[in-house]
């Protein structure tokens, strides 16, 4: 059977990210999924500063550290797949009432696109991509204190779609037609209007609490 080793790490801490990489030692990494992250919903002035900073540490700093270190390892071993889990929120200019979360996922999407371009230009066999789903039926909803306007997809569907698109070496992976249409819409309407629409959706979540 398959031998599984579980390593527990608090990715909000830099030292824990480094320890996780150290624990991998000289093992070859075929696929690395940067999946840790969480969100929060509310007016920016009213949400917890500590929670915001933890979100930045997990959603941005940990992803940055692990992407850089795993990328170096994959380059030295001659290839591999690295998938950063961002969000469709990262493809939208801004998200009122989830300001920190949207900004954190925009960082991941932007960084991933840039790194993917660098790798293509150097002819690398390493793949780097960003998975940008919308609502997925996980515990994210309860942690973020939100109810989504759109129905969520199952984790199984999201994972299977992501792996399929990763193997096709797609840089940005958006799992559903509805979200592809929504993120594409932003190219054709003023940013201020798009941000207002996004904010309206988040505000409805607050009203349903």
Locate each region found by the language model.
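Substrate-binding pocket helix/loop in short-chain dehydrogenase/reductase
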Residues: 43-45, 51-56
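Residue(s) in the substrate-gating loop at a strand-loop-helix junction
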Residues: 87
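C-terminal helical subdomain
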Residues: 130, 147-183
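Conserved NAD(P)H cofactor-binding loop of Rossmann-fold oxidoreductase domains
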Residues: 35-40
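The beta1-alpha1 cofactor-binding region of Rossmann-like NAD(H)/NADP(H)-dependent oxidoreductases
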Residues: 8-19, 49
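Active-site loop-to-helix junction immediately N-terminal to the catalytic Tyr of the SDR YXXXK motif
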Residues: 94-100
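Active-site helix of classical SDR
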Residues: 67, 104
